[in-house]
């Protein structure tokens, strides 16, 4: 029996396949040395998934590729900053064997972040913080300056609601992130010729750059 599914269910399945294939490609290209996570949205659910993966299945990897492409925003820049800015200060040892590094609830190894033209709102702010705090390199294409926060308003018809930008984010130099385009450290375009072949040039570039960083350290 063939049971039809909704368009949203189809999109969810395609997304999961894309993430799985991206993770498999990173494992293949790095020889198992790197892990891969995609931040689907700047929200609690996505954060829990990323947290679980980097400190769980990828705990023994030498570094992590953080993918923020196609992320529509939310509010997670502070959490991502804290999570990926860990600096090792102790190693727990049990009976002569290393158990874990500390801090044990933050990521202490090298990382790299991929971004793209479809990043929006906090998916602009998060890569900005990542670069501003010198946490790692940015790979991909420039992200439009869309980092604002909105106030959600509902009209008399509750099915009609919209967000009004009311919060700007100003740097110490007095520049607002809104309308300030963010440029990657490594500019790589996913050409349509390679996209239709299933090739992700931005992902490949991120793996190459992170491995070079690890090998030179």
Which residues does each predicted region cover?
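Metal-dependent DNA phosphodiester-chemistry modules and their immediately adjacent helices/loops
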Residues: 119-121, 156-187
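Cleft-lining beta-strand/loop regions that shape enzyme active-site pockets
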Residues: 1-157, 194-202, 208-215
């Amino acid at each position: 029996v063939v049971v039809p599914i909704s368009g949203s269910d189809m999109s969810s399945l395609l997304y999961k396949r894309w993430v799985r294939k991206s993770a498999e490609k990173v494992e293949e290209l790095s020889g198992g040395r790197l892990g891969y996570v995609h931040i689907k949205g700047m929200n609690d659910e996505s954060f829990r998934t990323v947290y679980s993966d980097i400190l769980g299945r990828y705990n023994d990897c030498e570094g992590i590729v953080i993918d923020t492409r196609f992320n529509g925003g939310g509010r997670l820049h502070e959490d991502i900053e804290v999570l990926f800015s860990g600096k090792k200060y102790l190693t727990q040892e049990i009976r002569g064997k290393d158990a874990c590094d500390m801090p044990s609830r933050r990521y202490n190894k090298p990382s790299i972040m991929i971004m793209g033209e479809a990043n929006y709102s906090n998916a602009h702010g998060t890569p900005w913080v990542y670069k501003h705090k010198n946490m790692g390199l940015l790979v991909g294409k420039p992200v439009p300056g869309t980092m604002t926060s909105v106030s959600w308003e509902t009209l008399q018809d509750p099915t009609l609601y919209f967000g009004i930008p009311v919060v700007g984010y100003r740097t110490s130099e007095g520049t607002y992130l809104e309308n300030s385009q963010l440029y990657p450290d490594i500019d790589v375009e996913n050409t349509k010729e390679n996209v239709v072949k299933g090739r992700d040039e931005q992902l490949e570039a991120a793996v190459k750059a992170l491995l070079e960083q690890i090998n030179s350290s």
